[in-house]
């Protein structure tokens, strides 16, 4: 029988970012209690030698699985050291891969009482408005004018440590254009 290949989307991530992600997940699972129902699987609990860890996040009757890998082929850059992350949404026997932005929105939808979802309606009805959303990574668009006005009136409180964001885990901070320092008209800036 011939080999059968299965292709998965894996975002290349540096190992320090993966360590930070794991640390935040464990903190909110065991200390703050905000990640109730989440489960963390260590590398020795998996049959795949490339899997470093798995975080299972229940979303109703489905779940989101964030898998970190090690020992992958290195990328084209020196800092791509064979670490990676894949994000999968599973429900019964069906599974599909999702992008980090959608993963953050799903986590936000199931785990947080959000200011933007209910603030406008509550304020019109005269109810007390929750001043902020604890999971800002779940927001990726500009809100309505009403939302922006209410957001300007309330002061959001910062939560330390922040809740782990899948988008932040997979963002490409290495390939962002670098700003060169120098005086106006300098040779380094203009290239002349």
Swiss-Prot record:
State the residue spans of region: Interaction with host APOBEC3G: 40-44
Q: Where is this region: SOCS box-like?
A: 151-180
A GO CC term attached to the entry: virion component
Which residue ranges traverse the bilayer? none
Q: Does the keyword Ribosomal protein apply?
A: no
Alphabetized, the UniProt keywords read: AIDS, Host cell membrane, Host cytoplasm, Host membrane, Host-virus interaction, Membrane, Metal-binding, Phosphoprotein, RNA-binding, Ubl conjugation, Ubl conjugation pathway, Virion, Zinc
Q: Which GO terms describe its molecular function?
A: metal ion binding; RNA binding
Segments of skewed composition (Basic residues): 176-186
Residues bearing Phosphothreonine?
A: 96, 155, 188
GO BP of this protein: viral life cycle
Annotated positions for site Cleavage in virion (by viral protease) = 150-151
Q: Which residues bind Zn(2+)?
A: 108, 114, 133, 139
Induction remark: Expressed late during infection in a Rev-dependent manner.
- Region of interest: RNA-binding: 75-114
The segments labelled Interaction with host APOBEC3F in the record are 14-17, 74-79
Task: Give one Pfam family, short name only.
Answer: Vif
Q: Where is this region: Disordered?
A: 162-192
Family affiliation? Belongs to the primate lentivirus group Vif protein family.
The record's note on quaternary structure and interaction partners says: Homomultimer; in vitro and presumably in vivo. Interacts with viral RNA and Pr55Gag precursor; these interactions mediate Vif incorporation into the virion. Interacts with the viral reverse transcriptase. Forms cullin-5-RING E3 ubiquitin-protein ligase complex (ECS complex) by interacting with host CUL5, RBX2, elongin BC complex (ELOB and ELOC) and CBFB/CBF-beta. Within the ECS complex, Vif interacts directly with host CUL5, ELOC and APOBEC (APOBEC3F and APOBEC3G) substrates.
What protein name does the entry list?
Virion infectivity factor
* Originating species: Human immunodeficiency virus type 1 group M subtype B (strain 89.6)
